Every structure is written in C-alpha cells, then in structure tokens.
C-alpha cells in the first residue's frame, strides 16, 4: 500500500484567537472600568471578573453558606434589598427593572457609569463606627466599636434602599427616580441623602460613647 502522506500537502488553517466579549451590565455599562476607592472594601464590593454579569440574578447561589453573600455582585445585592416589606417579597423581576431604570436615569443626569456611582454611594454610606450595648440587665452602657467591612457594606445597601423606599411612598416620583436621586446624593456625600444622614447620626452617637 502506497504511502500518500508525502504527496498530500494539507495545511490546516489556524483558527484566529478570539477574545471573550466584554460583559456589560444590562448590555450597556462596562464593569471593567469600575474602581473601588476604599481599600478596606475591595473584597466586599465585587464588580469585576467573576462578578461581572449581564443581569443581576444568580438564583440564590450566594445564600448557601454564611458570609457567602460577600461574593455576591453588588448590583444584585441592591436588587435583593429592594425586595423588602411583605408585599415585595420574591418580586425579583420588579426590583431588577427598578435598578435598570434607576441606572438609566443616573446616566442621563451625571453622564457617569451608574455602577461606579453605586460603588461610591456604598463606600460613602457605610458607617465606620457604631455603638454596642455592654453589660448585664442591671447596668447597661453603650460602647463605641469599629464596624467590620462586610457590615459596612450591608448597612450601606440597607440604608440606600430604605431611603429610596421612604422617598417614593406617597410621592408622585417613581421608586426608580427616588433610588437614582438617593444614589447620586450618596455618591457625592450630600446631606440630602437619607443614607448619609443616618450614617452621620450613627457615627455621632458612637463618638459620644467612646
């Protein structure tokens, strides 16, 4: 049997290396340019690499173990926190739509990446110092304590959502508009933000209990 390997000159075309497409939130906003300015919160405000998603929905995979929520994308944590008060429980589609509309409003008003505005708002809204109760039932006093980074993020998200919810109650403005205003004011550090006012109040009480 003749060996035909030498006569056949087959050249396989090398497939061009294709780069993975950049993941953009809602197909609009890049997550690679987002920067967490507070070094203590870098590990607790996940936005890049594994946390980059097209939609803020992971089907509850971050609730299986304690503290796993620290790895949950920050935009999804915002959407989850909006599902508060019994009438809103489980309405994830509604809260994702609210977040999307709020981000579009933020982009129109500021021209900045809305995810960066959210990250700045979380950094500015998390209290660095709080007070706790020390002592038995008879003699109880309050003592100032430092706040852990994860709790700072938790409280910041809760305060931002509470502020937006209370502003939208019995108001002509939609909750998406109120959430956009709250995030913009908190990112600037403005006292018009509910979250900034509450954070300053907590830190003032803690300072008096040092």
Swiss-Prot record:
State the InterPro entries in the record: Ribosomal_uS7, Ribosomal_uS7_CS, Ribosomal_uS7_dom, Ribosomal_uS7_dom_sf, Ribosomal_uS7_euk/arc
Example GO molecular function term?
mRNA binding
Write out the annotated subcellular location.
Cytoplasm; Nucleus, Nucleolus
Q: Which Pfam families match?
A: Ribosomal_S7
- List the transmembrane segments: none
- Gene Ontology cellular component annotations, sorted alphabetically: cytosolic small ribosomal subunit; nucleolus; ribosome; small-subunit processome
Q: What Gene3D superfamilies would the database entry show?
A: Ribosomal protein S7 domain
The processes (GO biological process) annotated in the record are: ribosomal small subunit assembly; ribosomal small subunit biogenesis; translation
Q: Does the keyword Transferase apply?
A: no
Record key words, sorted: Cytoplasm, Nucleus, Ribonucleoprotein, Ribosomal protein
Biological function: Component of the small ribosomal subunit. The ribosome is a large ribonucleoprotein complex responsible for the synthesis of proteins in the cell. Part of the small subunit (SSU) processome, first precursor of the small eukaryotic ribosomal subunit. During the assembly of the SSU processome in the nucleolus, many ribosome biogenesis factors, an RNA chaperone and ribosomal proteins associate with the nascent pre-rRNA and work in concert to generate RNA folding, modifications, rearrangements and cleavage as well as targeted degradation of pre-ribosomal RNA by the RNA exosome.
Quote the subunit structure annotation. Answer: Component of the small ribosomal subunit. Part of the small subunit (SSU) processome, composed of more than 70 proteins and the RNA chaperone small nucleolar RNA (snoRNA) U3.
Output the NCBIfam families linked to this UniProt entry. Answer: PRK04027.1, uS7_euk_arch
Q: Which family does it belong to?
A: Belongs to the universal ribosomal protein uS7 family.
What name does this protein carry?
Small ribosomal subunit protein uS7
The organism is Caenorhabditis elegans
Q: Which gene encodes it?
A: rps-5
